[in-house]
């Protein structure tokens, strides 16, 4: 039991999440987790935040009881989207986001090469928002998981799921433009009517 997507005050949106120490204290004590993936925005892009994150994981690993992962969140807009990047071991060098990928001109191919070489994995998430991915670079060897539920923020299993945001019309917009797995195709008018319907 655990969580693969927690933020701390190192993230640009982590002002309500607490410190790295708070995250691990919660995971070890209150939640009794077996694993935790802290995935602060762009923490793997700067040397200091990546070093600090790795140091916390190394210090707080409890063999046989608690296995935190070395990770960060790679945050881009659609079509490349947000991805949590996780490693089982420390010491993986910082991997900056190439300009062409940041601009959406290139996919995640270079990231995937880096992950294959370093033994890491990627988990796309926020798939129902403008920060989702278009799955153009799908590679199950380095991206074997996709987040569909966040314990702290929104859920993306389906519209109307617990903690889902009924105003997220991107569910429908995305299904009209892209083939996104198991989503149901509906006309835009139908999606808008459902989102605006009182609960």
What are these regions (language model features)?
Residues 1-199:
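Extended, charged catalytic domains and RNA/DNA-binding interfaces, predominantly
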